Amino acid sequence: MSLFDKKHLVTQADALPGRNTPMPIATLHAVNEHSMTNVPAGMEIAYFAMGCFWGVERLFWQLPGVYSTAAGYAGGYTPNPTYREVCSGQTGHAEAVRIVYDPAVIRYEQLLQTFWENHDPTQGMQQGNDHGTQYRSAIYPLTPEQNAAAHASRERFQSAMAAAGDHRPITTEIAHATPFYYAEDEHQQYLHKNPYGYCGIGGIGVCLPPDA
C-alpha cells in the first residue's frame, strides 16, 4: 500500500481478516502494577486516539485517578490485528489508548482536556511526522454521556482555536466505541520500559475552555 493509500480509510470489505486469538499481554501494568484487564467496581473506561500510542499512554497513566492504561487498536474492522497490519492501513484501526479511571477522582471532562490540549486535532490522517490512518485523532465514547461531552468539548475547543487566531477545522473522529484490541506486549507502557523512546505528540498551545 502506498503512503497516499494509507491516508484513506480502508472499507470493511477490503480490510484484513485478522484472527480470533487476542494478543498476549502482561497481567499487570508495568508502572503501577494494577490489572491490565479488570475494571474495579465504580471505575469507568475511556478510549482516545491522538497519534503514536506510546506517548499517549504515558500522558494518561500520569494523571491522578487513572487506574490503568493500555495501548491498542480501535475504530477499525480487523479482529485482533498486529502492529504491522495496523501500520499497513488495511485494518481501519487507529492507535488508541484504553483508560480505566475513577470518576470520583478524575472526571471524563478532565480526560477530554488532556486529550485536546496535548495533540494537534486538525491534521487528518497524521500526527506530526507520523503519517497514516492509524495516527488519526479520535474519541470513542462508550455511553451517551461520554458522547455528549465529547461533542461539546470539540465545539468549545474549535471556538477557543478561533479566538486564538487558528481557523483550521478540527478533524477529530467521534464515533461510538467498537471493540478495542490490545497491542502486543512490547507496546504496553513502552516509554516506561524505554524512557528515551520516541514520543511524537504535542499540543497547539490552545486550552480547552471549561464546561458550563
Swiss-Prot record:
The gene is msrA. Belongs to the MsrA Met sulfoxide reductase family. It catalyses: L-methionyl-[protein] + [thioredoxin]-disulfide + H2O = L-methionyl-(S)-S-oxide-[protein] + [thioredoxin]-dithiol; [thioredoxin]-disulfide + L-methionine + H2O = L-methionine (S)-S-oxide + [thioredoxin]-dithiol. It holds the Pfam family PMSR. SUPFAM superfamilies: Peptide methionine sulfoxide reductase (SSF55068). One of its GO terms (molecular function) is L-methionine-(S)-S-oxide reductase activity. Its EC number is 1.8.4.11. This is Peptide methionine sulfoxide reductase MsrA. Keywords: Oxidoreductase. It is an enzyme of class 1 (oxidoreductase). The keyword Cell inner membrane does not apply. The keyword Transmembrane helix does not apply. One of its GO terms (cellular component) is cytoplasm. GO terms for biological process: cellular response to oxidative stress; protein modification process. Has an important function as a repair enzyme for proteins that have been inactivated by oxidation. Catalyzes the reversible oxidation-reduction of methionine sulfoxide in proteins to methionine. The active site is at residue 52. It comes from Salmonella heidelberg (strain SL476). Coiled coil: none annotated. Gene3D superfamilies: Peptide methionine sulphoxide reductase MsrA. InterPro entries: Met_Sox_Rdtase_MsrA_dom, Met_Sox_Rdtase_MsrA_sf, MsrA_MetSO_reductase.
